């Protein structure tokens, strides 16, 4: 099985909250697609709650679009990581990590403005696969944690695992 890019970085030294360009690729027509690692929690130290992550998924995807989409950037998808330490964001364009960090911060401020559970978008049986698994309070706790710290920028060069280390890990 091929080793995915996300497993080529050293999770033991990964900071949070922080932004990382996880991948850049070009479509056959020449459009740039950038995948960002938006790390909310330090891996293997903490993780977002299940209900909070799910609620944040519903809120964050819309709010960050409000602050980052532009004539040169269009978000394709914002999805939580299975490890619940962050989100991946795929988009057309190449915004800087700093631009992404600013939009992320503004989106977290927007989360804190949501007043009621009933204000969570697409929270119904028809549009959500597990509509009972939500908590606005837990999503707000996650947002507050992000806003307490400055969102940093991760360096792939510093995080990449050497070929020697990957081999020693069985890859």
From Swiss-Prot:
InterPro entries: LuxS_sf (IPR037005), Metalloenz_LuxS/M16 (IPR011249), S-ribosylhomocysteinase (IPR003815). Disulfide bonds: none annotated. Gene3D superfamilies: S-ribosylhomocysteinase (LuxS). The keyword Lyase applies. Pfam families: LuxS (PF02664). Its EC number is 4.4.1.21. One of its GO terms (biological process) is quorum sensing. Its cofactor is Fe cation. It catalyses: S-(5-deoxy-D-ribos-5-yl)-L-homocysteine = (S)-4,5-dihydroxypentane-2,3-dione + L-homocysteine. Homodimer. Belongs to the LuxS family. This is S-ribosylhomocysteine lyase. The lineage of its organism: Bacteria, Pseudomonadati, Campylobacterota, Epsilonproteobacteria, Campylobacterales.
């Amino acid at each position: 099985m091929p080793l995915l890019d996300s497993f080529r970085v050293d999770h033991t030294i990964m900071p949070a909250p922080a932004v990382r360009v996880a991948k850049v690729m070009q479509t056959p027509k020449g459009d740039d697609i950038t995948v960002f690692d938006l790390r909310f929690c330090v891996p293997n130290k903490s993780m977002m709650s299940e209900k909070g992550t799910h609620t944040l998924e519903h809120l964050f995807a819309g709010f960050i679009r409000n602050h980052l989409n532009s004539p040169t950037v269009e978000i394709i998808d914002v999805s939580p990581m299975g490890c619940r330490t962050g989100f991946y964001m795929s988009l057309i364009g190449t915004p800087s990590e700093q631009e992404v960090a600013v939009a992320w911060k503004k989106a977290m401020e927007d989360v804190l403005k949501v007043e009621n559970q009933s204000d969570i978008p697409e929270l119904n049986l028809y549009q959500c696969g597990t509509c009972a698994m939500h908590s606005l309070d837990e999503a707000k706790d996650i947002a507050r944690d992000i806003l307490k710290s400055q969102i940093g920028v991760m360096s792939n060069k510093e995080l990449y695992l050497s070929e020697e280390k990957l081999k020693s890990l069985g890859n």
